[in-house]
Swiss-Prot record:
The lineage of its organism: Eukaryota, Viridiplantae, Streptophyta, Embryophyta, Tracheophyta. GO terms for cellular component: cytosol. GO terms for molecular function: ATP binding; galactokinase activity; metal ion binding. The modification N-acetylalanine is found at A2. SUPFAM superfamilies: GHMP Kinase, C-terminal domain (SSF55060), Ribosomal protein S5 domain 2-like (SSF54211). It comes from Arabidopsis thaliana. This is Galactokinase.
Amino acid sequence: MAKPEEVSVPIFTSLEPVYGEGSLLQEATQRFDVLKANFNDVFGASPQLFARSPGRVNLIGEHIDYEGYSVLPMAIRQDTIIAIRKCEDQKQLRIANVNDKYTMCTYPADPDQEIDLKNHKWGHYFICAYKGFHEYAKSKGVNLGSPVGLDVLVDGIVPTGSGLSSSAAFVCSATIAIMAVFGHNFEKKELAQLTCECERHIGTQSGGMDQAISIMAKTGFAELIDFNPVRATDVKLPDGGSFVIAHSLAESQKAVTAAKNYNNRVVECRLASIILGVKLGMEPKEAISKVKTLSDVEGLCVSFAGDRGSSDPLLAVKEYLKEEPYTAEEIEKILEEKLPSIVNNDPTSLAVLNAATHFKLHQRAAHVYSEARRVHGFKDTVNSNLSDEEKLKKLGDLMNESHYSCSVLYECSCPELEELVQVCKENGALGARLTGAGWGGCAVALVKEFDVTQFIPAVKEKYYKKRVEKGVVKKEDMELYLFASKPSSGAAIFNL
C-alpha cells in the first residue's frame, strides 16, 4: 500500500468526501455555486475544474521546520477554492477574486516572468504557483507546450495575516489547479516540496510545514510532518479536548516585514549553526559551505553533551554561544569571512543583513533545539499509556512552554498575542500559544471539550469586547476570528 505522501491529490465529483454533511456541506455547496456563477459573469464561460487547499493551525513546533525539524500541525476547515479554465486563444493570466477588496490582476502567460516584489499585489501568489509549477514540470521532462492563457477565480476564507497559512492555502490550491488543468497529478510529497519552493518566489524563506499539511491533511488527525524527505504520520489527539483558534486582530504581513522578522530569524539560525560547527571542531570554510541549519550540527552538539553525561544539544548552545547579541564584526572574526559572502550574496539574506543591527544567536538556537524536543514530547504524550485527562494536561503544559520560548527566546510575539494567550489561560485553557509565524495573527488554545461553550464567551468578553467597541472588529464577524476546530481534510480537485 502506498504511503500517504506517495499518493496523488484526490479527484472528486461531489463535495461530501471533503466537506462531510450538515451545515458545513451546505455552506460549501453555496460557495461553489456562487463561485461557478461569478466565474461565468466575469469570464463568460464555465470553469473546467476546481481545486481547494485548507489553512492550518500549528499545534506545536514553531519556527523549526526551516531548521530541518519535525512539526505538528492540523488542517482547519477554512480553505481557498480556485476555479480555473485554459484559454488557448489568449496569452494572459486573468486572476479575479470573489472578494471586491482584491481587484483583478492580469499578467502575461510567461513562466519566466519576474515577480515585482517592490510592488506587492495579491495576484503575485498565483504567479509564484504558476512559475513554480512550470519549473518543476520542466525538471521532470513534462512537455506543457507553448504557454496558454488562464482564467482564474479565487475564493479564500482563511483569514489573512492570521498565522493560519492563508498564503500557503492560496499557493497550494493555485498550484494544484494549474497542475490539474494541464492534465497532470503529482504525488503529494512532490507537491509539498514544489509549493514550498513556489512561495520563495515572493521572498519568503518558507520551511515547508504549511504546504505539507495543507496537501497531506486527513480528517480527524493532526500530522507529524517530517522533512528531507517530506512525510506525514497521523497523530490521533486524545478524546475530550478541543482546539480553539483566536485571532489577535494584529495582522502579520510575513512577506512585507520579512527582512526584520521571519527571514531575520532564518539568517540568525544559519549563523548560530555555523558558529556552533566551528566551535565544535569544524574549519570555518567547511562550516560555511556545509552547515545550513541547526539540525546539521545537532550531532556535534549531542556528542559534546554526551561527554558531559547528557544528550541535550542545549549544553553546547550554553557553552559556545554568548547570551549577549553579536555584532556583524564579531561573527566575521569567528568565521574569518564577511557576512554577505557567508550567505552567498543571496538577495533575501542580504536584505536581512542590511536591516539588522545585531544578532541574538544564543536565544534563537535555544528556542529551536528546545522546541524540536517539545514536538516529540507532544507526540510521545499522545501515544503514551496516560489517561486522556493526564494527556491533555501534559499537552497543555508543552504548549505553554512553547509560547514562552517563542515569546522570550525567539521574540516572535506581540503585545496583542501576549494579552490573548493570558486571557485564554485565565479562562480555562489547559495551554495556549501563538501559532504561525507570529508578530500578530492567531493563538491556539487547548480546552476541555465540555468547557468550550463557556470558554468562547469568556474570551469574547475579556479580549474582543473592547475591540468591538473601538471598531477594530465587527460583532457579526466574530465567528471568523474565534472558533473551535477539529482536524480537517487536505487538498482536493473537484470536477463538478
